[in-house]
């Protein structure tokens, strides 16, 4: 019996060594996604709540949706970016000459190598994707932010948008890690997500495979019940990329001290181990 116990201890220690070695040879990329809820419900107060949390988290990249600018409101992503010292890439189907523009954005404090955008098909759904490649710890990281069609019956529209999103990522990415954040307006098990989940790992689901739907939910049930997990962070599935989700947390799940919610959505912060 003593011999078996000793052999078991040796096996456990042997298995533990590679994990510690892997952790020592990886850097951690911190990624946030959040639907800003445009200018609804006291934006100046919500802005303060969002800024405080982002300063605490110090993410390497932030993916934003429902970003608004109009003659009365400065571009919300630019307001955040200036306060945080970040580069801002804003993507909108509304041209730069338009007084009102609405879309997605990416913020990063790191040196930007590429920033661009693409409108998603179908054109009459007015959806876009933002793309930034930035330098990070001796590597190049490609980040994408998007927001898909919103109706429950619109699965076919979302499927088309996902096909175009995946093709766009394939045609624009570099050789480093890829992260995709956004409001997909659907959960992982829906038919329209099949392509996405065949190519990418959902960070929250990977880290918390046994979380209940309520625990993982990203839409505030006070605003609409039973929406579930519609905001996602994705990284690649391919083992050769050596990218591993190691942590994920739902953020903005509680109101601030003055009862102000950051958004009608909760946000996600994921930590991704990237092998050196």
Label for each model-derived stretch:
Residues 158-176:
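A long, amphipathic alpha-helix that forms part
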Residues 34-36, 66-67, 146-148, 182-184, ...:
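Active-site metal-binding loops of divalent metal-dependent hydrolases
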Residues 133-135, 170-179, 186-276:
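Metal-dependent phosphoester-hydrolase catalytic domains
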Residues 43, 61, 65-148, 245-250:
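Structured beta-strand-rich core segments of catalytic domains in phosphoester-bond hydrolases
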Residues 13, 21-83, 90, 96-100, ...:
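N-terminal, active-site-proximal structural segment of metallo-dependent hydrolase catalytic domains
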């Amino acid at each position: 019996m003593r011999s078996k116990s000793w052999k078991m201890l040796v096996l456990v220690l042997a298995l533990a060594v590679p994990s510690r070695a892997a952790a020592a040879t990886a850097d951690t990329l911190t990624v946030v996604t959040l639907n800003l809820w445009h200018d609804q419900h006291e934006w100046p107060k919500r802005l303060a709540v969002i800024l405080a949390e982002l300063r605490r988290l110090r993410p390497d990249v932030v993916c934003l949706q429902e970003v608004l600018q109009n003659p009365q409101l400065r571009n919300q992503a630019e307001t955040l970016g200036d306060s945080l010292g970040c580069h801002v890439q804003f993507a909108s189907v509304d041209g730069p000459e338009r007084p009102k523009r609405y879309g997605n954005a990416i913020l990063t404090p790191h040196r930007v190598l590429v920033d661009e955008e693409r409108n998603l098909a179908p054109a009459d759904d007015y959806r876009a994707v933002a793309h930034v490649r930035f330098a990070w710890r001796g590597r190049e990281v490609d980040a994408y932010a998007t927001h898909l069609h919103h109706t429950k019956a619109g699965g076919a529209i979302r499927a088309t948008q996902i096909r175009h999103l995946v093709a766009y990522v394939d045609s624009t990415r570099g050789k480093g890690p890829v992260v995709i954040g956004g409001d997909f307006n659907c959960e992982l098990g829906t038919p329209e997500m099949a392509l996405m989940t065949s190519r990418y790992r959902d960070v929250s689901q990977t880290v918390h495979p046994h979380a209940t739907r309520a625990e993982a939910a990203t839409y505030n049930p006070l605003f609409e019940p039973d929406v579930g997990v519609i905001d996602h962070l994705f990284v690649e599935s391919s083992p050769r990329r050596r990218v591993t989700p190691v942590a994920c947390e739902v953020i903005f799940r509680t109101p601030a001290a003055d009862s102000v919610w950051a958004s009608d959505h909760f946000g996600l912060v994921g930590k991704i181990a990237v092998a050196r």
